[in-house]
Amino acid sequence: MSEDFYDVLGVSRDASKDQIKNAYRKKAAKYHPDVSDEEDAEEKFKKVQKAKEVLTDDEKRQMYDQLGHERFQQAQKRGAGGGGGGRGQGNPFGGGGNPFGGMGGGGFEDIFNNLFNGGGGQRRSRPQQGRDVAQRITIDLEDAYHGVERDVTIRRREVCPECDGEGHPADADVNTCSECNGSGQQTTVQQTPFGRVQQTTTCRACGGEGKTYSEDCSECRGSGRVRRTRDVTITIPAGFRDGQRLRYRGEGEPGENGGPNGDLFVEVNVRDHEEFDRDGDDLQYTHPISFPQAVFGATVEVPTLDGEAELKVPAGTQSGSTFTVSGAGMPHLDGRGNGDLHVEIHVVTPEDLNSEQREALKQFAEAGGEEVKESLFQKLKNSL
């Protein structure tokens, strides 16, 4: 992958911000370490993130276009360290004499603070929290009703067990870094469109340690991290809704420089049910009854996610009428009761009638003043 940020995203140098963002989304989806099987996916993903960060920031992009890739990267390499230094420390943009100060947020002062970090001495690496890990799981509505435990397999970076995260064998020879003479820093003078700027950066050869080792760990190749899979037990509480997420602190990737682990986020998807439709914590259900039950009324049993429930259907009930079974819906997440079950009645019109049934319906129609014709039964069907 090319180092140039425009090449990394595959866009032209006059690309709009929207084009850059669209290109970033495609590249990020391709190289995300949780998705891609490429060995260098993580490195490519970081390059894509960095390219997007710079090219969608108007001021950083302007600096990048002016300085070029190499100069811009040198200016940003892990910061120049220390703050507070003024012109006397070699940074013409530091201290109270900063000619670009007082311009408000986002001015040139911010640019040089971001790029050169004030210019002065060494800046110690701060503890950083590890990356979060995302996972998705699908459950049935019955599982969401009762609550359930599931094991999910996650893939994440972990501290290398071979070298305990050091990146080298315990018996490796230790040498003073020849690049920085053991200081852990390198000082360079950078020519910018605004003049010469002195930079003190973390030594790339030793990573700021001031020492190097005779060999790298054979397991992690010096990175101190290895990619592993592990099972995590997920507890989904009763009443969980489709699309909600669970957070498990510390189950993500290990932190850097003593920082805490990242977190694990699990998105729960709930499958559609064959009989019930969910609306928040309420459930919708359609229940069929016979024509006589609709006429005379009846007590019927309707299914719920926790067994059967009795429902009284009053005489003269029409198709489409809705009745409520209180507390027969989904549990509330706070544990305080349940939603309701709303039952829509569907009156089933008989299709095949024997002679007695047909005669009874004719008498029913005549008693109601209906003219008995061949279309009577169809009319009854349409009226129900």
From Swiss-Prot:
Domain J: 4-68
Cellular component terms per the entry's GO annotation: cytoplasm
Disordered: annotated segments: 74-105, 113-132
UniProt xrefs under InterPro entries: DnaJ, DnaJ_C, DnaJ_domain, HSP40/DnaJ_pept-bd, HSP_DnaJ_Cys-rich_dom, HSP_DnaJ_Cys-rich_dom_sf, J_dom_sf
Swiss-Prot/TrEMBL keywords: Chaperone, Cytoplasm, DNA replication, Metal-binding, Repeat, Stress response, Zinc, Zinc-finger
Residue positions binding Zn(2+) 1: C160, C163, C217, C220
Cofactor: how and how many bound: Binds 2 Zn(2+) ions per monomer.
Domain of life: Archaea
Compositional bias ranges of the Gly residues kind: 79-105
CXXCXGXG motif repeat ranges, renumbered to this chain: 160-167, 177-184, 203-210, 217-224
GO biological process: chaperone cofactor-dependent protein refolding; DNA replication; protein refolding; response to heat
Zinc finger (CR-type): 147-229
Cofactor: Zn(2+)
Positions annotated to bind Zn(2+) 2: C177, C180, C203, C206
Main location: cytoplasm
Keyword Zinc: yes
Matching Pfam families: DnaJ, DnaJ_C, DnaJ_CXXCXGXG
Gene3D superfamilies, per database record: DnaJ domain, Heat shock protein DnaJ, cysteine-rich domain, Urease metallochaperone UreE, N-terminal domain
Listed GO MF terms: ATP binding; heat shock protein binding; unfolded protein binding; zinc ion binding
Subcellular location: Cytoplasm
Family indicated by similarity: Belongs to the DnaJ family.
Subunit relationships: Homodimer.
Recorded domain comment: The J domain is necessary and sufficient to stimulate DnaK ATPase activity. Zinc center 1 plays an important role in the autonomous, DnaK-independent chaperone activity of DnaJ. Zinc center 2 is essential for interaction with DnaK and for DnaJ activity.
PANTHER family: DNAJ HOMOLOG 1, MITOCHONDRIAL-RELATED
Reported function: Participates actively in the response to hyperosmotic and heat shock by preventing the aggregation of stress-denatured proteins and by disaggregating proteins, also in an autonomous, DnaK-independent fashion. Unfolded proteins bind initially to DnaJ; upon interaction with the DnaJ-bound protein, DnaK hydrolyzes its bound ATP, resulting in the formation of a stable complex. GrpE releases ADP from DnaK; ATP binding to DnaK triggers the release of the substrate protein, thus completing the reaction cycle.
Protein name (database record): Chaperone protein DnaJ
Annotated organism of origin: Haloferax mediterranei (strain ATCC 33500 / DSM 1411 / JCM 8866 / NBRC 14739 / NCIMB 2177 / R-4)
Gene: dnaJ
